[in-house]
């Protein structure tokens, strides 16, 4: 696939999957669109409806996504970090409307400096607010779902608005009510009034903790969800998964639930899948538990 086959929009380009995933995986190409405004999104939907670009698919920062080794007939939509979808608006009473393209860690830092917090435990999670919401990201016993009051987005398959309000449910461990084809555009989150100095200190401590425990190399974070009342990392370590390698990827010696690319170069998605399947096989054969991936594949 080349961009010459598609309607040319000023905010689109053709990239290799390895350029849009934090794991740097996937040698195939895909169309990537970075709309800044609602008008840009409308232009994308119009082009899709006319068959001038491939089907649209949401893309956050690519921090928990596995790419493809072949070209895919998709147009990945990554909201621009310098457009209207990264704005933060104070609504009063601790409520803020936050654009889905805003980076989660930076947003929490800015809110802390303004005297709002309560989510410091999530501040070390990489990626965008939209991506964190789509998977209900969590850390330190917290989940982002706890702060959500409403969501707004766009169903890329139908072109229709999509919305969620508190009380409608749909949240769970690494699970949200957001359908796979919905591109989140904003969310209303509720924060507590806090001491800026104390909240900034908590965020600083979380960043320091992350730096200590995060394995070296390009990665997409934890490979598998924790099974009920158990730890995926512990099961993987018990079954000898540390050090397994395929291509440029290996299971980290520091944390058995991480696959890392210590070369930081481009790798094949198939090598990641080889490791993922072997990790699953070992745990299932030894412990009778089929680990469920935390990573996603587009659409």
Residue ranges of predicted features:
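Short acidic (Asp/Glu) patches
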Residues: 61, 105, 135-138, 167-171
């Amino acid at each position: 696939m080349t961009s010459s086959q598609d309607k040319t929009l000023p905010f689109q380009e053709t990239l290799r999957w390895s350029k849009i995933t934090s794991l740097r995986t996937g040698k195939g190409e895909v169309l990537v669109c970075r709309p800044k405004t609602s008008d840009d999104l409308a232009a994308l939907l119009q082009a899709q409806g006319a068959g001038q670009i491939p089907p649209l698919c949401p893309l956050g920062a690519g921090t928990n996504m596995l790419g493809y080794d072949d070209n895919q007939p998709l147009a990945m939509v990554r909201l621009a970090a310098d457009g209207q979808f990264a704005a933060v608006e104070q609504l009063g009473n601790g409520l803020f409307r936050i654009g889905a393209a805003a980076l989660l860690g930076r947003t929490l830092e800015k809110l802390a400096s303004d005297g709002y917090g309560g989510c410091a435990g999530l501040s070390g999670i990489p990626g965008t607010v939209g991506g964190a919401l789509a998977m209900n990201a969590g850390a330190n016993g917290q989940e982002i779902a706890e702060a959500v009051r409403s969501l707004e987005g766009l169903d890329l398959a139908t072109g229709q608005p999509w919305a969620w309000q508190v009380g409608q449910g749909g949240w769970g461990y690494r699970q949200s009510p957001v359908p796979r084809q919905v591109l989140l555009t904003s969310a209303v989150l509720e924060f507590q009034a806090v001491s800026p100095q104390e909240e900034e200190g908590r965020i600083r401590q979380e960043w320091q903790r992350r730096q200590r425990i995060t394995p070296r190399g390009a990665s997409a974070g934890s490979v598998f969800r924790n099974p009920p009342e158990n730890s995926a990392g512990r099961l993987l370590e018990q079954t000898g998964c540390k050090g397994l390698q395929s291509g440029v990827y290996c299971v980290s010696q520091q944390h058995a639930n991480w696959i890392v690319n210590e070369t930081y170069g481009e790798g094949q998605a198939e090598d990641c899948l080889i490791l993922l399947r072997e990790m699953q096989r070992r745990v299932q054969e030894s412990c009778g538990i089929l680990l469920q991936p935390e990573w996603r594949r587009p659409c």
